[in-house]
Amino acid sequence: GRQPIQRDKTINDNYYLLTLAAIAKEIRQRGLPPECSVRIAAGLPLTSFGRDKPKFKDYLLRSNQPVNYKFEGVEYSITIEEVAIFPQGYAALMTETGLLQDEPSMLLMDLGGWTVDLMRIDNAIPAADTAHSLELGMIRCVDDIREQVRRETGLSLTDAQIENMLAGQPCTVSDTVRDIVNKQGRKYTEHLLSATMEAGFDLHAIPAVLLGGGASVVSRHLSPKDGLCKTIFLLDDKVNAVGFERALAAVSRRKSEA
């Protein structure tokens, strides 16, 4: 099931344990021995990156090395050599370097579970003073749809049903229910665009790069009448992870050349 919303991941060990599980899976997938050294590349939201980076790095890079644990019947002994923290969303642009080269200014929109994090990028550099967060993430969108369907039909849909319909995937429901979900998806998109404009970002004037869980929803519910300058969607759910890996490789390369 979904982990409860936790704005500060360092308040308990949940995220740390998930990280150890992910390391074990990665080691197994790559055919590495269960006793090895690793480097972690992780991310934080644009709006809290500067504030939370030192604490989050310490949270992941603990003094009791190596870390010994058992996962799915296998004993692991992992030495975490390095932890590098990058801004979510911006790191994902490492996967699409042409975007940074072709546009002098763009708006980065990371549509997460609880928030939509916004930041302008000028000449390939994040403008940190423009960082803004809207509490319009996908959890709120799904909750609003569930309530609207219940109000109009008396039915109680699951998150999975709603998410499938928003993504245009199969789901056995009536046309009436599907219409409600699609109308709410469009309503959510309109609300998000309006809130973004109100936050001071002119979507008619600068291109927007959208990623995160909500990006596919917006991609299906945009309309030509919205009159947006240009929208680029990074819909691969691994785009941030790939970006972190490339960013870490670039940092390591610079260190070795220094």
Map each language-model feature to its residues.
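Nucleotide/phosphate-binding catalytic cleft detector across ATP-hydrolyzing
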Residues: 1-106, 125-139, 160-258
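Short, glycine/acidic-enriched loop or turn micro-motifs at the edges of active sites
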Residues: 91, 113-114
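Short hydrophobic beta-strand that contains or immediately precedes a catalytic carboxylate
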Residues: 108-110
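Short glycine-enriched loops at secondary-structure junctions
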Residues: 112-113, 214
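Short beta-strand scaffold segments in enzyme catalytic cores
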Residues: 116-120
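Long, charge-rich alpha-helical interaction segments
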Residues: 143, 147-150
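Short, basic interhelical loop/turn and adjoining N-cap
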Residues: 153-155
